[in-house]
Amino acid sequence: MNRESRTVTLVVSIASATTTTLPAFLTGALAVVIRHHLDLTTTQLGLLVSTFFAAAIPFSLLIGPRVKLLGVERLMRIAVASTVLSLLTIALLDSTFLSILVSLILAGAANGVMQPTVNQFLVGRIKLKGQGLAFGIKQAAVPLATLLAGLAVPLVALTIGWRYGYLGAAIFGIVTFVAIPTTNKGSTEQGDRTATKVVLGPLIILAMGMAFGAGAANAMGAFLVSSNVHSGFSPGTAGYLAAIGSASSFITRIMSGFFADRRRGNHLTVVAAMLMIGAVGYLLLSLCNPELVVFAGVLAYAAGWGWNGVFNFAITKTHPGSIAHATGITQAGLYCGSLLGPSLFGVLVDHYSFAVAWQVNAVFAVIGAIAMWIGRRALRAELAGRDLGA
């Protein structure tokens, strides 16, 4: 694959993943405005975001093993088109809690299809020696989505109206849909390997680690703006602060992927260490101290939510012929955590405080780190004799 084709692959990957992630994080970031417009509680807002991830779980598990059969590019286009439909529904129709809920169910299903599919898309087009960076760039789609969502508060929601945030995301999705290739003309040998055995036990443990780590991170993505407002910042400033945190995660994901290509193994150990550092960031956020918000947010985002690319790279290296299947399983763990994390966070805020919610987030990150370490040991035991660098 030449440099131009590789660049197109990376751009399409991050644009596709960003499009199908935007509905959840737009809803979280715009919550401070939507809440007053539709008279919603914090618990209801958490439920909206969680429903998105709940809808993704069955599709990630069902589509993962069937991606090659159904067609990678075809599935990507279907997922993006479904997301655009959900965004336009929220933007153009008279929204209620129920209508937004239904729209986010459709968007969540599309995201469940997209994640294992775009993993296969990447590995089918990028050579092994560059896949760590490729996954880092692809996983940077999530902080890019939260960055755009954070900027949507001061630049869109507080100026021309919150619905225009969804409309802008829909336009981005339409451009992405057009950019997705109709056929795979850049396939690499890596993408066409014979299916390898999926080691289910270790993958389930690692999926649990994903659940706890991502549950904490997605709660942060959904509620950091609201938490910053509670700490005394204006909604506009709170949105900018969230965007700064998202930018740090964006950079970390790309750089961690870059270094993963230059490191022989131990990728899951790095993931566990990053989760532990992220827990410190959550604890600092629990202080609700305006002077610490920027540092705590950057630490929590960069470490607590910067590990996903390295994680997926490790899974693809240990399952070179069953990439979509294996990452579909671990992605389901991420969705489970993302389902429960924002909902629990919202309940804790409503019944206790933001401080308690951030402390629970820190505990979740620590549990996730422990699960990653245990899962790595189990995976290495199962794959003894195979030099695949977990």
Label the model's feature ranges:
Residues L69-V80, R262-L275:
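Cytoplasmic membrane-interface "Motif A"-like loop-to-helix N-cap segments
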Residues G321-F354, N361:
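A late C-terminal transmembrane helix in Major Facilitator Superfamily
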Residues N266-F311:
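C-terminal transmembrane helical hairpin of 12-TM major facilitator-type secondary transporters
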Residues S82-S95, I277-N289:
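C-terminal ends and interior cores of transmembrane alpha-helices
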Residues S99, I137-P181:
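Helix-loop-helix hairpin linking two adjacent transmembrane segments in secondary transporters
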Residues F59-G71, R253-G265:
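Helix-to-loop junctions at the C-terminal end of transmembrane segments
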Residues L104-A141:
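Cytoplasmic helix-loop-helix junction between adjacent transmembrane helices
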